[in-house]
C-alpha cells in the first residue's frame, strides 16, 4: 500500500478551487487565495496540493501507530459521504449533529452508547414482554441514539485525530478537540479561519464532488495506515487462522 495519489486536474474537476463570494471571505485566508473571478474567490491549488499531501500523511501515520480517526461532517451534502468514507476505512464518524460535550464529556456519551447497546439487546429479544406502544417508543429511542452516536459506538474513547468538513459549522467540535489536544485536519474554504486548524486543506467545502474527493483520499490514507500497521507486525493478518481483536472494539466492550 501507499498514500493515495491525486492530481491538480482532479482538484480542478471537483471544483476545489472555487471559494465563496469575495464579500464573504475571512481575511485570514488571504495567503491561500489565488485571485477572484466574477466576484468569487479562487483558491490557490498550488498550495492545496502539498497541504493535502501532508494531511494524508498525518492520517496514515496516525492509523499506522494504532490511532483512531474521527470523520466529522453534519451538513447535508457531506453527511452520507462522511459516513461511507469512515466505514470503508474502519474509522468513526459524526454526521448528524454534534452534541455539545461529545469529546469533552466522554463519560456521559459512553453512558448513552451503553444505553444504545442495551436497546439493541432488548429489541432483538422477541420475548421482551412489551406492549406494541412500549416497543415503538423503544425503537424511536434507539433510532434517535443511533443517528447521533452510531458512528462512534465502537470508538472506545476519544479519537487521536479529527477530519472535519466545514469548520464554521463544526466550530464546537473544533473547540472540543483543542481543549483535549486532539489534532485537526480540515478543509478550509475562503470564509474559514485557518488559525484554528493543525493541518488545513485550502479548498471548497460545499460542492459534493469536492467533499467526495477529500473523503475518498482521507479514507484511502487511513487504509494505507492499516496496511502499514499490519506490515509492522511482521505477518499477514488476513491469512491468519485467528484474527486479533481490534483494540478499539475491546475498549468499547469494556466501557
UniProtKB/Swiss-Prot annotation:
Keyword list, A-Z: Ribonucleoprotein, Ribosomal protein
Protein family membership: Belongs to the universal ribosomal protein uS2 family.
Protein name (record): Small ribosomal subunit protein uS2
Region ranges (Disordered): 232-255
Disulfide bonds: none
Organism listed in the record: Sinorhizobium medicae (strain WSM419)
Gene3D superfamilies: Glucose-6-phosphate isomerase like protein, domain 1 (3.40.50.10490), Helix hairpin bin (1.10.287.610)
GO molecular function: structural constituent of ribosome
Any GO BP: translation
Amino acid at each position: 500500500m501507499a498514500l493515495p495519489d491525486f492530481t491538480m486536474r482532479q482538484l480542478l474537476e471537483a471544483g476545489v478551487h472555487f471559494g465563496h463570494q469575495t464579500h464573504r471571505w475571512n481575511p485570514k485566508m488571504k495567503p491561500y487565495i489565488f485571485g477572484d473571478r466574477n466576484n468569487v474567490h479562487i483558491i490557490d491549488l498550488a498550495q492545496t496540493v502539498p497541504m493535502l499531501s501532508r494531511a494524508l500523511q498525518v492520517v496514515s501515520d496516525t492509523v499506522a501507530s494504532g490511532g483512531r480517526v474521527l470523520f466529522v461532517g453534519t451538513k447535508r451534502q457531506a453527511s452520507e459521504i462522511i459516513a461511507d468514507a469512515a466505514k470503508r476505512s474502519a474509522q468513526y464518524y459524526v454526521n448528524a449533529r454534534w452534541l455539545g460535550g461529545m469529546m469533552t464529556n466522554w463519560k456521559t456519551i459512553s453512558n448513552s452508547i451503553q444505553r444504545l447497546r442495551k436497546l439493541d439487546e432488548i429489541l432483538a429479544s422477541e420475548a421482551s414482554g412489551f406492549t406494541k406502544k412500549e416497543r415503538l417508543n423503544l425503537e424511536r429511542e434507539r433510532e434517535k441514539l443511533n443517528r447521533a452516536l452510531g458512528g462512534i459506538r465502537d470508538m472506545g474513547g476519544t479519537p487521536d485525530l479529527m477530519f472535519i468538513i466545514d469548520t464554521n459549522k463544526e466550530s464546537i467540535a473544533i473547540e472540543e478537540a483543542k481543549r483535549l489536544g486532539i489534532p485537526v485536519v480540515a478543509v478550509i474554504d475562503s470564509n474559514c479561519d485557518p488559525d484554528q486548524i493543525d493541518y488545513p486543506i485550502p479548498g471548497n467545502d460545499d460542492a459534493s464532488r469536492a467533499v467526495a474527493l477529500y473523503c475518498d483520499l482521507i479514507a484511502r490514507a487511513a487504509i494505507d495506515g492499516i496496511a502499514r500497521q499490519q506490515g509492522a507486525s511482521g505477518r499477514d493478518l488476513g491469512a491468519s487462522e485467528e484474527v486479533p481483536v481490534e483494540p478499539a472494539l475491546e475498549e468499547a466492550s469494556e466501557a
